């Protein structure tokens, strides 16, 4: 094989590859063995047609595409390795010369990973946020636990207050006409939760059980149902029942109820403080790392190929769809509620996708500049962590991952971020 790489404008170039005649003829032989299984000619059993008769009847050219399908997935990766290039997209292949008994010549138009011109990345002036947890923070968290353990008790008398849960009937009208989805009976609503259209819940405060009221609101301009967005509406409301939260006492019994690992409120308080400290520290560390990467990336210069942005966009779309699925939704429903389509969502994500690509390229360049390496032992340690996290044997993790090259690159990027933190 001979390989020639010609760099062109931007991040594109043309790879010219010549595959020797022996290798090409072997691919033709393999193509014939595959194709002949489906060929029937009178006088011969299916799959037993002689090669010479096959070529006489159908022409050797009929084998070329199958031979290319066999050859290119093997020879193209060899060619890019020999040329020392790093493609970021599928190549555009053109066959320049193809003939039985001769060498095969093909070209591949390739977009390659761009060069990064690093700016300042050491001594970046980024301060880590204070991760101190105050007694007020702990008390606020305990109050939240207390609130979540509260029981709803029917108010025998008295009016609706913020935080109460009401059972009500409602029916909405726009321009005097009822609209789809605007009616419910015996609906439970926590007043002040912000679950309904702005202005609706506030107008329930002060009403008593049995009260009826016309609640006037205006749908937000960005409301998911376009036929209602920005329009005034009237909801006829009837209050059936009002329930108030009855908070449990903050004592040792409460502590044991919310956490079986503690015996006293003091233990729960201490455990809560440690948990908040860990969460705040992780948040501060995460923000620090994010800001350092952002600054280093802003200081770097790189011409990002559109192909890399498109690949990142596809990855972000998949991540977004997975998050929706975890919430019991899919893309189709999301588009229906948001009034967006896939193109609009991708357009919205495009800037972030480009930033992600630039940040990653910058970190890879920093890792190369500082000669940051990842050992086999570090990869093995990461695999062990994954096996523990997924509660699977490490061999199963290795089998699922296959090659660990991508993991090595991820760990190298992580080391580059560690370097930024240590040298800020």
Swiss-Prot record:
Consists of 3 domains; the N-terminus binds the ribosome, the middle domain has PPIase activity, while the C-terminus has intrinsic chaperone activity on its own. One of its GO terms (cellular component) is cytoplasm. The keyword Chaperone applies. GO terms for biological process: 'de novo' cotranslational protein folding; cell division; chaperone-mediated protein folding; protein transport; protein unfolding. It is an enzyme of class 5 (isomerase). It comes from Bacillus pumilus (strain SAFR-032). Its main location: cytoplasm. Pfam families: FKBP_C, Trigger_C, Trigger_N. InterPro entries: PPIase_dom_sf, PPIase_FKBP_dom, Trig_fac, Trigger_fac_C, Trigger_fac_C_sf, Trigger_fac_ribosome-bd_bac, Trigger_fac_ribosome-bd_sf, Trigger_fact/SurA_dom_sf. It is found in: Cytoplasm. GO terms for molecular function: peptidyl-prolyl cis-trans isomerase activity; protein folding chaperone; ribosome binding. Its EC number is 5.2.1.8. Involved in protein export. Acts as a chaperone by maintaining the newly synthesized protein in an open conformation. Functions as a peptidyl-prolyl cis-trans isomerase. This is Trigger factor. Keywords: Cell cycle, Cell division, Chaperone, Cytoplasm, Isomerase, Rotamase. Belongs to the FKBP-type PPIase family. Tig subfamily.
